[in-house]
Amino acid sequence: LYDEKGKKLELDQSVYKDLGLSTPTNPYNAELCVNRGIFAMLNEAVRALVDDKIVEKAEEVDLAMIMGTGFPPFKGGLMKYADSIGTRKITDELLRFADDVGPRFKPAESLMKMADGNEKFYDKF
């Protein structure tokens, strides 16, 4: 959340009291929350692009994500964003998420192979 001047706002802790809830003991980690959602989408996009060949090019995934889900265009789309992060970091994070919260975050085999070769989506597809 941002105020009218564009300054990022912090989570209002009084919300917990208003809802009759206790304050969480673990700190809120915005990056973790964002990455968990983005990397899960990316894992599925890899399956659509590489494994199932539903789309032929990384830019088709990006266009669909920007136009269909509102993925931020300034990031270049989901696959371009993934290229900027790197497949190794993405697979490492997905493996950590799989350990923490379950197998639905297990990286696609094709993504792990790309990470082993440090490949980029826009170079390969």
Sequence positions of predicted segments:
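N-terminal glycine-rich phosphate-binding loop for ADP-containing cofactors
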Residues: 1-125
